UniProtKB/Swiss-Prot annotation:
Catalyzes amidations at positions B, D, E, and G on adenosylcobyrinic A,C-diamide. NH(2) groups are provided by glutamine, and one molecule of ATP is hydrogenolyzed for each amidation. Disulfide bonds: none annotated. The active site is at C330, H434. This is Cobyric acid synthase. Keywords: Cobalamin biosynthesis, Glutamine amidotransferase. The gene is cobQ. The lineage of its organism: Bacteria, Pseudomonadati, Pseudomonadota, Gammaproteobacteria, Vibrionales. It comes from the Bacteria. It comes from Aliivibrio salmonicida (strain LFI1238). NCBIfam families: cobQ (TIGR00313), PRK00784.1 (NF001989). Belongs to the CobB/CobQ family. CobQ subfamily. Pathway: Cofactor biosynthesis; adenosylcobalamin biosynthesis.
Length: 495
């Protein structure tokens, strides 16, 4: 298909705004009636999403697909790295986990990964009119340039034009842009179409002399300056978002384990006006919570040991003695059980450790992951049956022992199965379902069970949609997009 030229967005640093800029450009093009798809050759993240065909990609690419108004697909993020130690990560290729590699092992593997990356890019080119590509980190990382598949290595191999974005809010924006360009090869410099400055606050007339200097020194145009957009409630790709517009009275505490995954599960709580969501870090206590939720984890056994080292297991026991409620999601659910077994060494050395012992389940880690989008019903004590939707990403298989109550009924392709566990007293609930709080009925049932009565869920889809449209409007107003797609946009002043 490929009617319009693809574009790659690279950044001078991590968190320069690449993910949001790609999402915004996808929405701008979609609003023009263009069939557009996002693409990220290589992503490193613990927040992942499940595609309809049972593959796994970065959640950022799923968000960008939403912005493009298309369904997420494994080819949108062919290489996903999910760190499970400080020097190692699980490598996922076109949606499927292949093995865990250390940093040096992956450096060697990259030359083998490029064909998969180019195959996925070709698939998107064949099925969409335009592809907007996101780089990773910075293209100027000298130590990572050999066999690069994430930035200029891909752009050169696929012959894709590039724009470079920098975050002026961090300071040093001209050094970042000038220095990044200077560290590229001549052929790489030639494919850079221009610069974008992101997150600007203040009087732009004060910035103009610097923009003119940059254009003169580099010979590259500044395509525009995007203002700082306050209150954008989009999922965070890496760092946990903790800011709240307003804090409620009902305190929910989440212990931050070392390999916390899919912390976007808690965005519905963080943004709710009745809830004070607190992420509890090293050396802090879980005491004072109305509700405790154990999050997902990429290294469940190691994080369970860390949880104990912080004394959080004792905080949980005390919380339960005083009538509090506890919930576990995915890895947190496994921790609440009786045993955790890793006979194949999926997370390191083969091992068997005791869980917290609050739920009548035992979990064994398997090589094959469960990757599924699910819908069903949630049945909690003293609550009406609630619709539930979510997704499963886990290697563990949990076996229910005597006395386990199964609170989630999943209807999948005419097959009824069960998920989760509830203790005999009805005070502890565990589930494998990520995204469970994003379904309003499930949110209201869980929070009512936990003690927050008659509180209505917020509409996360509407919040995300509003944020994406704000970004798209700002991009279209701020950038001279005619320099990227002249047949679609009229020329305008960039600043």
């Amino acid at each position: 298909m490929n009617t319009f030229a693809p574009l790659m967005v690279q950044g001078t640093t991590s968190d320069a705004g690449k993910t949001v800029l790609v999402a915004g450009l996808c929405r701008v093009l979609s609003n023009k009636g263009i069939q557009v798809a996002p693409f990220k050759p290589q992503n490193m993240a613990l927040n992942s999403a499940v595609t309809e065909d049972g593959g796994e990609i970065g959640r950022a690419q799923a968000l960008q697909a939403d912005a493009a108004r298309v369904k997420p697909h494994v080819h949108m993020n062919p290489i996903l790295l999910k760190p499970n130690t400080d020097i190692g990560a699980q490598v996922i290729v076109q949606g499927k986990a292949i093995e865990t590699m250390d940093a040096w092992g992956f450096q060697d593997y990259k030359k083998l990964a490029m064909p998969y990356v180019l195959e996925s890019f070709a698939y998107l080119n064949d099925h969409y009119q335009c592809v907007v590509v996101e780089g990773a980190g910075s293209p100027a990382e000298i130590n990572l340039r050999e066999n690069d598949i994430a930035n200029m290595g891909f752009a050169e191999a696929a012959d894709v034009p590039v724009i470079i974005v920098a975050d002026i809010d961090r300071g040093g924006v001209f050094a970042h842009l000038y220095g990044t360009l200077a560290l590229l090869s001549e052929s790489e410099q030639a494919r850079v179409k221009g610069f974008v400055i992101n997150r600007f606050r203040g009087d732009i007339s004060l910035l103009v002399p610097g923009l003119e200097w940059l254009e003169e020194k580099t010979g590259k145009p500044v395509l525009g300056v995007i203002p700082y957009l306050h209150g954008l409630n989009l999922e965070a790709e890496d760092a946990i978002k903790s800011e709240q517009q307003e804090k409620g009275q009902f305190v929910v505490k989440v212990p931050v384990v070392t390999r916390i995954s899919n912390h976007t599960d808690f965005d519905s709580l963080r943004l709710h006006p009745d809830i004070d969501l607190q992420f509890v870090g090293k050396g802090q206590s879980l005491s004072g919570a109305d509700f405790i939720i154990l999050p997902g984890s990429k290294s469940v056994q190691a994080d369970l040991n860390y949880l104990r080292s912080q004394g959080w297991d004792k905080d949980i026991e005390r919380h339960l003695r005083f009538g509090g409620k506890v919930m576990g999601i995915c890895g947190g659910y496994q921790m609440l059980g009786e045993q955790l077994s890793d006979p194949l060494g999926i997370e390191g050395e083969p091992s068997l450790i005791d869980g917290l012992g609050h739920l009548a389940i035992s979990t064994e880690l398997k090589k094959q992951k469960q990757l599924t989008l699910v819908e069903g019903e949630l049945h909690l004590p003293n609550q009406s049956s609630a619709k539930v939707k979510g997704y499963e990403i886990h290697a563990g298989v949990s076996i229910h022992t005597a006395g386990a109550h199964l609170p989630v009924i999943i209807n999948s392709e005419s097959i009824v199965r069960y998920d989760g566990a509830l203790n005999h007293e009805g005070s502890i609930f565990g589930t494998y379902l990520h995204g469970i709080f994003d379904e309003p009925e499930a949110f209201e049932a869980i929070m009512s069970w936990a003690g927050l009565k008659e509180s209505k869920a917020i509409d996360m889809k509407e919040i995300q949609e509003e944020a994406i449209e704000r970004i798209a409007a700002s991009i279209e107003e701020s950038l001279d997009l005619s320099q990227l797609w002249p047949s679609l946009f009229e020329k305008k002043a960039a600043y």
